[in-house]
Design a protein with these regions (language model features):
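A structural motif at transmembrane helix-loop-helix junctions in multipass membrane proteins
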Residues: 22, 130-168
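Hydrophobic alpha-helical transmembrane segments of multi-pass membrane transport/permease proteins
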Residues: 14-40, 49-65, 156-171, 208-218
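Hydrophobic alpha-helical transmembrane segments of multi-pass membrane transport proteins
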Residues: 46-111
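N-terminal Sec/SRP start-transfer signal
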Residues: 1-21, 229
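Junction motif at the cytosolic side of a transmembrane helix
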Residues: 142, 210-231
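Short alpha-helical transmembrane interface motifs in multi-pass membrane proteins
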Residues: 51, 59-64, 94-95, 120-128, ...
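Terminal transmembrane helical anchor/hairpin motif
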Residues: 168-215, 219
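Alpha-helical transmembrane segments and their short interhelical loops
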Residues: 89-90, 97-147
């Protein structure tokens, strides 16, 4: 646990020096704040931009940052030096994963406040966001572990995060895309958030898709780790 906290603090410092990674965490919360206050359109659903940018945030930030951090440190052989220094792979993953999850959840709190959620609604919103963030983090870890260079990892991560981040938005305008999007965890989280805003009942199929996605992402991560390792 001590080593994990060291990795956590190291990642905080490294991210503070990397503007590109910092932007990933603040971009969509800032856009939501601006759009929620600057744009008012008749018949627009309440807090429309909160839901839209929240999904983009959980679909892009954790996946992209997790991929970038792991692939960069693999390419620079930083991980090998850490492991020689008695840091285990589990401690490393817990450290960087804890930081990325915490940073993304700060954004989720911003979305929750903007959305006007209170009490149990606010907690439910954060739990829903946390589930999506965890899936995205695991997918990012898989890509980072499997790729041998940061360029290769970015090449693969970009289309993956674009799909999960923008599929729910595209599904609003096309029924065909909506049918495909129903299998994506980001779409079901969008529906859960919409239902929370509208005060409707939770659909079991939405929870099922998110749960299956979390299990599948965990399985992919375990397979990638056993096959490729971190160093």
């Amino acid at each position: 646990m001590k080593n994990s906290m060291i990795i956590f603090r190291k990642q905080v410092k490294d991210t503070g020096k990397n503007i590109a990674l910092c932007i990933q965490f603040v971009m969509f919360p800032m856009m939501a704040v601006i759009m929620e206050n600057a744009i008012k359109i008749d018949n627009m659903p309440p807090h429309f931009f909160v839901g839209m940018f929240a999904i983009m945030h959980l679909g892009m930030a954790p996946l992209n940052v997790m991929t970038a951090v792991i692939s960069e440190e693999k390419e620079k052989n930083t991980l090998r030096m850490l492991f020689f220094g008695n840091v285990t792979p589990a401690e490393y993953l817990l450290g960087i994963g804890g930081f990325i999850f915490s940073a993304c959840m700060v954004g989720a709190v911003v979305f929750g406040i903007l959305g006007g959620y209170r009490g149990m609604q606010f907690i439910y919103f954060l739990l829903t966001m946390a589930a999506g963030i965890c899936v995205s983090m695991l997918l990012g870890a898989v890509i980072g572990i499997r790729c041998k260079s940061q360029i290769a990892a970015t090449t693969i991560a970009t289309p993956v995060m674009m799909i999960f981040a923008f599929l729910p938005m595209l599904a609003m305008f096309n029924d065909g895309i909506a049918k495909v999007a129903d299998f994506a965890y980001s779409q079901q989280i969008q529906l859960l958030i919409n239902g929370l805003t509208a005060g409707t009942e939770v659909k079991p199929e939405s929870l099922l898709v998110v749960a299956v996605s979390l299990v599948a992402a965990t399985g992919l991560f375990i397979h990638a780790y056993r096959r490729c390792g971190l160093a």
